[in-house]
Amino acid sequence: MNERFFKFAREASKKADYTGGRNNPVAIGAVAVYKKSIVAEAWNTDKTSPLQAKYNKYRYHNPALKDKNHAETAICSKLRWKFGDSLDWSKVDIYLYREYKDGSLAMSRPCKSCLHMLREEFGVKRIFYTTPEGYVEERFKD
């Protein structure tokens, strides 16, 4: 775990324009790290995404709601566009950052749909995310 990458994810979270459902704005930023370098950044947004629509079936989802792009979906889309099939996803680390309005850390663990996407479609092995208690590393088994 590298706290420096969380700083970049924090900056990405400031670009989020996700207004959320139920009047609950949530700003999450993400960076993808490959071979110790940041190769992409993303954030959640009100824009819709077909990839998000595909994976929303893995969590409770109201079909009347739009499939707004989560930071994890956005970063995977960017990586796929940038690298095509040449990227070894098992060596990509995803850092996620979220904070409350007062600047304290908030939970940024991916939802069920994004966890499924990261593990099953892309083969990501490690994610790092914020919690109110600090930073967490989560590893996925084969």
Question: What does each of the following model-derived ranges do?
Answer:
Residues M1-D142:
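Zinc-dependent deaminase catalytic domain
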